[in-house]
């Protein structure tokens, strides 16, 4: 598993207009070629009256699966420029379809490249990008009297508290890079004078916004 990678924040759409033509970018997270192709077909069915539904996707830790489709636009003017935007932003496991409704003015090859790549770029700005970091989920159990201390420490150290449970005792689940767990445990033990129990809940990806 990768220690970290970038992908889209969420599925979404964004529209731009160029010389009367509408370009609607649709984004979806995907983990297989089947998922990507299914997503593309879904968009094509929804926008069956559109002039074109061009698409691109990247899948896998090393981008093992990647495809670009022009859907009737001149070869190399749509799918490949769209794919290049995904690569430039270092994204993984993403599919994008750009739906075009022709507005009456031809854009030429260069204009099409700029339009399709621009639709993807503007769409990414609108829906956002996140960095997924592989982190250890560490549960801390302690007395209610220490809630403020732990919250303040985590806040000042930029350590996310991803879950809080209040029962007989308090249990916070914190998300940390694996290499920082030991130092964090030592700091909490010192802070709470050893009045704390730890349990590792395993590793999972935590998402951080990319500005």
Describe these PLM feature segments.
Residues 78-126:
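Active-site beta-strand/loop microenvironment that shapes enzyme catalytic pockets
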Residues 25, 54-55, 93-96, 137, ...:
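Structural motif
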Residues 174-183:
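Terminal, non-globular segments
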Residues 161-165, 192-209:
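Conserved short beta-strand edge segments in small beta-sheet-based binding/regulatory domains
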Residues 1-76, 199-211:
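C-terminal regulatory domains involved in ligand/effector binding and gene-expression control
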Residues 150-155, 183-192:
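Short amphipathic alpha-helices in soluble, non-transmembrane regions
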Residues 128-144:
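Short glycine-/aliphatic-rich beta-strand segments at the starts of folded cytosolic domains
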Residues 141-159:
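Short amphipathic alpha-helix segments
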């Amino acid at each position: 598993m990768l220690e970290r990678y970038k992908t889209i924040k969420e599925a979404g759409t964004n529209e731009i207009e160029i010389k009367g033509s509408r370009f609607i970018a649709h984004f979806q997270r995907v983990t297989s070629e089947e998922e990507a192709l299914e997503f593309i077909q879904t968009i094509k069915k929804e926008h069956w009256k559109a002039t074109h539904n061009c698409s691109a996707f990247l899948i896998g830790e090393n981008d093992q699966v990647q495809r670009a489709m022009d859907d009737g636009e001149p070869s190399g003017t749509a799918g490949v420029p769209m794919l290049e935007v995904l690569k430039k932003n270092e994204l993984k496991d993403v599919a994008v379809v750009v739906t075009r409704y022709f507005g009456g003015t031809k854009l030429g090859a260069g204009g099409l490249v700029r339009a399709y790549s621009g639709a993807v770029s503007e769409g990414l700005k609108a829906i956002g990008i996140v960095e997924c970091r592989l982190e250890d989920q560490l549960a801390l159990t302690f007395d209610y009297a220490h809630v403020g201390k732990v919250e303040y420490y985590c806040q000042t150290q930029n350590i996310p508290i991803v879950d809080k449970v209040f029962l007989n005792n308090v249990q916070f689940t914190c998300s940390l890079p694996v290499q920082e767990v030991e130092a964090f445990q030592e700091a909490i033990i010192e802070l709470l004078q050893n009045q704390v129990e730890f349990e590792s809940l395993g590793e999972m990806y935590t998402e951080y916004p990319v500005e």
